[in-house]
């Protein structure tokens, strides 16, 4: 035990000290004695035996803060690697569904219910369920690869989106949070600290939002005050002094804009940060992990490179604020978000951002660990690039990044990247409502299979309903395809022109028909480039199958009905008696074939046959059906006539050649030639001014004049007489063929007229007709 004796001080010359000297603070003296007096005093040591101070000294344990050089991996609780009050929440966060995600979430629940139902019933619907799951994944992929700007804003603001410290916890080996701006305040909205990634030490600075209401209040919803920016500035100086690369994480709606912050110098703090960051000689990398609002984000965002997560946004004013200013209502936020160009893809095009870090489908909150690893990869890659630069090169690199933003050359024409179809294609993706209908249909099939164990054939009403629904979906697919290939406006204009031309006042003109055919051909050619081509193709195939099934079902039903009606007609007493009498006479005659029957019996058989056929024809007419067999027989008869009489065929071909040569001769005359040229000019004018009635009327008048001139020339050339003679020969040959055919059904007067006209149309050149 060691003893230390108390020593006293004897003061000399104290009488010269003033009273005010003894009233000074202890910081200016020792034991109440002013330093000024101590400087003039004479010291003597007096030992007092009646007073002693004792203390017990022992060797203390030396601590290594914050981490030992060689930590024991088997220590209880594991090696501490994270020094901060923040702790991960794990899976305790309540799931939040955004408005545009609700249809897919409900669909996913239904697919789960269908799988559960199939397992309970023991029925095998594996293929259908797998198909639905694949379609669901494709719909999810289409949704998140074609998000609108306002949808990306909503994802960036998602309550469960991982925060700055969540990513730090996932990517750093060790991290120690540093507090305070050394001016009496520690803003929790900005978190700073030193951490290591793969053995390399970095200074991390970032905005920190809350993960629940309590944390949001503590973190002020990620909106920093001047104290927060001054804390970040202090850490930047610290990193620059020690040579630590700086990594900043941006996730704030903006700097806190209350009256107190303005009094404390919010603008000055942000401006000071901007000025200082341009002079730091260490690498600076900024990553936008959520939303970056105006100067509040830029105060820690002046970096050599700025990267953005796929669904992050960066703006000078929020879409709601912009809409309130320009459109006087926040409901125009979707349009404002599109006009502001605040998404990662747009900002990379504008050279504001330098790269995009991918996110999983569903956003960063769907898989925070995977997102953090992508951030870690991006940090390592960019820091390896910056590590090859000196301090001066880093300053030049940082300056060049911001100098190239917004650069354009006035007066110099720039070729567009796309010279054809400059209209931007609209995103087309799978409709979750259609997929939901398929899920409901499968669910009904499972329930039906559970009750009947066999899937019944759908009724005609169900089939018609499915076909109509499929036609409606195909119309929607065609509309989406037209929008995607950039033909929507032309199709709309063509529809209007067609509706005018098809009305009573307007006639359909060949010019319009030709334009329609050209547009149709162009649409069919470009249809394969549409994003929804495969979906449209599958639905067309499905419609074809349904139509065939419907036709087969109707044919079967019609066949049954016809057989039933025929049987009823044959079973009538008068018909049955005649048929039975004929059968008895034929049996008593002993003839083995029709040719061996007597002539009187033949006539009787043919007469009875005609009566039965007439009765059956009446049955068909009563059902609203017509007989095509007669017309087919007429066609076959004409072919037989041409085959039997080669001379008649030669005459017909020769007459056609004469008519063609005469028409060509007439067209080459100066009068007709000038009329044809005028017709071409009027047709060209009409194609440039669609919908003009006068142009079409003028074209029709010219066509009628040309046709009349050609008809007059043909009538005066003697070709009409040749045609009349040839028609007489054809009629005689037709009568002869009709007499030779046994048991043929005779045609009525109307059919004779039709066949005559048909013969003319087959015989005479179409241009002459």
UniProtKB/Swiss-Prot annotation:
GO cellular component terms, A-Z: acetyl-CoA carboxylase complex; chloroplast; chloroplast envelope; chloroplast inner membrane; chloroplast stroma; endoplasmic reticulum; plastid
Any GO BP annotation: malonyl-CoA biosynthetic process
Keyword Transit peptide annotated: yes
Pathway(s) per entry: Lipid metabolism; malonyl-CoA biosynthesis; malonyl-CoA from acetyl-CoA: step 1/1
Reactions it catalyzes: N(6)-carboxybiotinyl-L-lysyl-[protein] + acetyl-CoA = N(6)-biotinyl-L-lysyl-[protein] + malonyl-CoA
Modified residues (Phosphoserine): 741
Residue ranges that the Swiss-Prot or TrEMBL entry lists as coiled coil: 426-504, 631-744
Molecular function (Gene Ontology), one example: carboxyl- or carbamoyltransferase activity
Chief localization: plastid
Compositional bias per record (Acidic residues), positions renumbered to this chain: 738-756
Organ and tissue specificity: Accumulates in fatty acids synthesizing tissues such as embryos, expanding leaves, flower buds, flowers, and developing siliques.
Keywords recorded for this protein, A-Z: ATP-binding, Chloroplast, Coiled coil, Disulfide bond, Fatty acid biosynthesis, Fatty acid metabolism, Lipid biosynthesis, Lipid metabolism, Membrane, Nucleotide-binding, Phosphoprotein, Plastid, Plastid inner membrane, Transferase, Transit peptide
Membrane-protein topology: Peripheral membrane protein
Subcellular location: Plastid, Chloroplast inner membrane
Listed EC numbers: 2.1.3.15
Residue ranges with Basic and acidic residues bias: 721-732
Feature: transit peptide: 1-54
Keyword Coiled coil part of the UniProt annotation: yes
Function in brief: Component of the acetyl coenzyme A carboxylase (ACC) complex. First, biotin carboxylase catalyzes the carboxylation of biotin on its carrier protein (BCCP) and then the CO(2) group is transferred by the carboxyltransferase to acetyl-CoA to form malonyl-CoA.
Quaternary structure, from the entry: Acetyl-CoA carboxylase is a heterohexamer composed of biotin carboxyl carrier protein, biotin carboxylase and two subunits each of ACCase subunit alpha and ACCase plastid-coded subunit beta (accD).
Similarity-based family: Belongs to the AccA family.
Name under which the protein is recorded: Acetyl-coenzyme A carboxylase carboxyl transferase subunit alpha, chloroplastic
UniProt source species: Arabidopsis thaliana
Lineage: Eukaryota, Viridiplantae, Streptophyta, Embryophyta, Tracheophyta
């Amino acid at each position: 035990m060691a003893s230390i004796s108390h020593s006293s001080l004897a003061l000399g010359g104290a009488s010269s000290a003033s009273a005010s000297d003894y009233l000074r603070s202890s910081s200016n003296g020792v034991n109440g004695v002013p330093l000024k007096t101590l400087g003039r005093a004479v010291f003597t040591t007096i030992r007092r035996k009646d007073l002693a101070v004792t203390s017990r000294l022992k060797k203390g344990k030396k601590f290594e803060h914050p981490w030992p050089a060689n930590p024991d991996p088997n220590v209880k609780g594991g090696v501490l690697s994270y020094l901060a009050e923040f702790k991960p929440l794990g899976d305790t966060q309540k799931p939040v569904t955004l408005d545009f995600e609700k249809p897919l979430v409900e669909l996913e629940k239904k697919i789960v219910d269908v799988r559960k139902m199939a397992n309970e019933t023991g029925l095998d619907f594996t293929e259908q369920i797998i198909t639905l799951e694949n379609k669901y994944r494709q719909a999810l992929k289409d949704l998140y690869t074609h998000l609108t700007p306002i949808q990306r804003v909503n994802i960036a603001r998602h309550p469960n989106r991982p925060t700055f410290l969540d990513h730090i916890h996932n990517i750093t080996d060790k991290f120690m949070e540093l507090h305070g701006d050394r001016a009496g305040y520690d803003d929790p909205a900005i978190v700073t600290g030193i951490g290591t990634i793969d053995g390399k030490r970095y200074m991390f600075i970032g905005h920190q939002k809350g993960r629940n209401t309590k944390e949001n209040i503590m973190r002020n919803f990620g909106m920093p005050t001047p104290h927060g920016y001054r804390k970040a500035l202090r850490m930047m100086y610290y990193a620059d002094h020690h040579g630590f690369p700086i990594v900043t994480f941006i996730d704030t709606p903006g700097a806190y804009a209350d009256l107190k912050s303005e009094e404390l110098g919010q603008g000055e703090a942000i401006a000071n940060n901007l000025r200082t960051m341009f002079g730091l000689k260490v690498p600076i990398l900024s990553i936008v992990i959520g939303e970056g609002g105006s100067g509040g984000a830029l105060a820690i965002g002046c970096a050599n490179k700025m990267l953005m997560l796929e669904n992050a946004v960066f703006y000078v004013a929020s879409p709601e604020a912009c809409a309130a200013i320009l459109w006087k209502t926040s409901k125009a936020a979707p349009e404002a978000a599109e006009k502001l160009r605040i998404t990662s893809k747009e900002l990379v095009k504008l050279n504001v951002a330098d790269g995009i870090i991918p996110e999983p489908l569903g956003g960063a909150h769907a898989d925070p660990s995977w997102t953090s690893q992508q951030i870690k990869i991006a940090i390592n890659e960019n820091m390896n690039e910056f590590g090859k630069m000196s301090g001066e090169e880093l300053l030049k690199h940082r300056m060049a990044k911001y100098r190239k933003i917004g650069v354009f050359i006035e007066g110099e024409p720039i070729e567009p990247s796309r010279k054809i179809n400059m209209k931007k294609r609209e995103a087309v993706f799978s409709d979750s409502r259609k997929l939901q209908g398929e899920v409901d249909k499968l669910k009904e099939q499972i329930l039906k299979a559970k009750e009947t164990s066999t899937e019944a054939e759908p009724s005609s009403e169900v089939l018609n309903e499915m076909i109509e629904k499929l036609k409606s979906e195909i119309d929607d697919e065609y509309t989406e395809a037209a929008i995607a290939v950039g033909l929507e406006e032309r199709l709309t204009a063509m529809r209007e022109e067609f509706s005018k031309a098809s009305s009573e006042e307007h006639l359909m003109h060949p010019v319009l028909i030709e334009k329609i055919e050209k547009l149709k051909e162009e649409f069919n050619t470009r249809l394969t480039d549409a994003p929804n081509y495969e979906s449209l193709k599958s639905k067309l195939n499905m419609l074809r199958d349904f139509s065939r099934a419907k036709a087969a079902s109707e044919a079967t039903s019609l066949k049954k009905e016809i057989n039933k009606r025929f049987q009823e007609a044959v079973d009538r007493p008068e018909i049955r008696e005649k048929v039975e009498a004929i059968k008895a006479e034929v049996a008593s005659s002993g003839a083995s074939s029709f040719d061996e029957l007597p002539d009187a019996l033949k006539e009787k058989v043919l007469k009875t046959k005609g009566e039965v056929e007439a009765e059956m024809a009446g049955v068909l007419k009563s059902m609203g059906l017509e007989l095509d067999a007669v017309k087919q027989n007429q066609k076959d008869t004409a072919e037989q006539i041409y085959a039997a009489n080669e001379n008649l065929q030669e005459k017909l071909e020769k007459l056609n050649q004469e008519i063609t040569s005469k028409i060509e001769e007439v067209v080459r005359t100066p009068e007709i030639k000038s009329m044809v040229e005028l017709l071409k000019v009027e047709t060209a004018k009409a194609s440039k001014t669609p919908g003009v009635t006068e142009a079409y009327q003028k074209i029709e008048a010219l066509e009628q004049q040309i046709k009349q001139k050609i008809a007059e020339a043909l009538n005066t050339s003697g070709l009409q007489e040749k045609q009349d003679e040839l028609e007489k020969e054809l009629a005689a040959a037709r009568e002869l063929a009709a007499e030779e055919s046994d048991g043929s059904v005779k045609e009525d007067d109307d059919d004779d007229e039709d066949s005559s006209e048909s013969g003319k149309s087959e015989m005479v050149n179409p241009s002459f007709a």
